[in-house]
């Protein structure tokens, strides 16, 4: 069922790195009542993420990097273990993820498989993330990875079982990473 939405005002509060909007809108409820809402919405663009896995070695490739938002929210070191990811900018999701994989992990991926698209924080963030997986092998390692000039990324090749355990221990706390690791487990690609 489609609800009627009328935009009243869209005020840009910040357009520094991403865009923060203050949006006022009227929402017509199912019973016909019109309710006025005022919300802040953070537009950071859409993104893509990929989990690299090796079924023969039973390993996955993840990265560790500083994430300021986690630091602000109590992660003492600010370090987060996660899947390779990036913003689309003007690229198609598959093009983006191939670029990010080589930059961040050093692996030049072959065939990729798109799984799904998800909003990760739809209450206030516009970002839609495209989720991919790809099998990798040692001979696909083109460089050391580590990201571009302003990034400081550590590449982690981990046993799949250890990565799953790291979810339980709280060492992996990134939503997209947990989703992809759980997908890999339930799909039985590592059996």
Swiss-Prot record:
<dbReference type="InterPro" id="IPR015797">
    <property type="entry name" value="NUDIX_hydrolase-like_dom_sf"/>
</dbReference>
<dbReference type="InterPro" id="IPR000086">
    <property type="entry name" value="NUDIX_hydrolase_dom"/>
</dbReference>
<feature type="binding site">
    <location>
        <position position="104"/>
    </location>
    <ligand>
        <name>Mg(2+) 1</name>
    </ligand>
</feature>
<feature type="binding site" description="in other chain">
    <location>
        <position position="67"/>
    </location>
    <ligand>
        <name>GDP-alpha-D-mannose</name>
    </ligand>
</feature>
<dbReference type="Pfam" id="PF00293">
    <property type="entry name" value="NUDIX"/>
</dbReference>
<feature type="binding site" description="in other chain">
    <location>
        <position position="17"/>
    </location>
    <ligand>
        <name>GDP-alpha-D-mannose</name>
    </ligand>
</feature>
<feature type="binding site" description="in other chain">
    <location>
        <position position="104"/>
    </location>
    <ligand>
        <name>GDP-alpha-D-mannose</name>
    </ligand>
</feature>
<keyword id="KW-0378">Hydrolase</keyword>
<feature type="binding site">
    <location>
        <position position="104"/>
    </location>
    <ligand>
        <name>Mg(2+) 2</name>
    </ligand>
</feature>
<feature type="binding site">
    <location>
        <position position="151"/>
    </location>
    <ligand>
        <name>Mg(2+) 2</name>
    </ligand>
</feature>
<protein>
    <recommendedName>
        <fullName>GDP-mannose pyrophosphatase</fullName>
        <ecNumber>3.6.1.-</ecNumber>
    </recommendedName>
</protein>
<feature type="domain" description="Nudix hydrolase">
    <location>
        <begin position="43"/>
        <end position="180"/>
    </location>
</feature>
<dbReference type="GO" id="GO:0016818">
    <property type="term" value="F:hydrolase activity, acting on acid anhydrides, in phosphorus-containing anhydrides"/>
</dbReference>
<dbReference type="GO" id="GO:0019693">
    <property type="term" value="P:ribose phosphate metabolic process"/>
</dbReference>
<feature type="binding site" description="in other chain">
    <location>
        <begin position="85"/>
        <end position="87"/>
    </location>
    <ligand>
        <name>GDP-alpha-D-mannose</name>
    </ligand>
</feature>
<dbReference type="GO" id="GO:0046872">
    <property type="term" value="F:metal ion binding"/>
</dbReference>
<feature type="binding site">
    <location>
        <position position="100"/>
    </location>
    <ligand>
        <name>Mg(2+) 2</name>
    </ligand>
</feature>
<comment type="similarity">
    <text>Belongs to the Nudix hydrolase family. NudK subfamily.</text>
</comment>
<comment type="subunit">
    <text>Homodimer.</text>
</comment>
<feature type="short sequence motif" description="Nudix box">
    <location>
        <begin position="86"/>
        <end position="106"/>
    </location>
</feature>
<keyword id="KW-0479">Metal-binding</keyword>
<feature type="binding site" description="in other chain">
    <location>
        <position position="127"/>
    </location>
    <ligand>
        <name>GDP-alpha-D-mannose</name>
    </ligand>
</feature>
<feature type="binding site">
    <location>
        <begin position="38"/>
        <end position="40"/>
    </location>
    <ligand>
        <name>GDP-alpha-D-mannose</name>
    </ligand>
</feature>
<dbReference type="InterPro" id="IPR004385">
    <property type="entry name" value="NDP_pyrophosphatase"/>
</dbReference>
<feature type="binding site">
    <location>
        <position position="85"/>
    </location>
    <ligand>
        <name>Mg(2+) 1</name>
    </ligand>
</feature>
<keyword id="KW-0460">Magnesium</keyword>
<feature type="binding site" description="in other chain">
    <location>
        <position position="176"/>
    </location>
    <ligand>
        <name>GDP-alpha-D-mannose</name>
    </ligand>
</feature>
<feature type="binding site" description="in other chain">
    <location>
        <begin position="150"/>
        <end position="151"/>
    </location>
    <ligand>
        <name>GDP-alpha-D-mannose</name>
    </ligand>
</feature>
<dbReference type="GO" id="GO:0005829">
    <property type="term" value="C:cytosol"/>
</dbReference>
<dbReference type="GO" id="GO:0006753">
    <property type="term" value="P:nucleoside phosphate metabolic process"/>
</dbReference>
<comment type="function">
    <text>Nucleoside diphosphate sugar hydrolase that hydrolyzes GDP-mannose as its preferred substrate, yielding GMP and mannose-1-phosphate.</text>
</comment>
